[in-house]
């Protein structure tokens, strides 16, 4: 059975890249931190 996967990338106010992977359930979410200058 082939299911549709929704890929979405959003940037929050802290310039962190948020990669959201939804496969039927919104539980599969990965957070990727962007490189921050310190």
Curated annotation (Swiss-Prot):
| SUPFAM superfamilies registered for this protein in UniProt | STI-like
Q: Which domain of life is it from?
A: Eukaryota
Q: Does the keyword Disulfide bond apply?
A: yes
UniProt keywords, alphabetically: Disulfide bond, Protease inhibitor, Serine protease inhibitor
Report the sequence similarity comment from the record: Belongs to the protease inhibitor I3 (leguminous Kunitz-type inhibitor) family.
Assembly: Heterodimer of an alpha and a beta chain linked by a disulfide bond.
Instruction: Write down what this protein is called.
Output: Kunitz-type trypsin inhibitor beta chain
Per the UniProt entry, what species is this protein from, by scientific name? Neltuma juliflora (Mesquite)
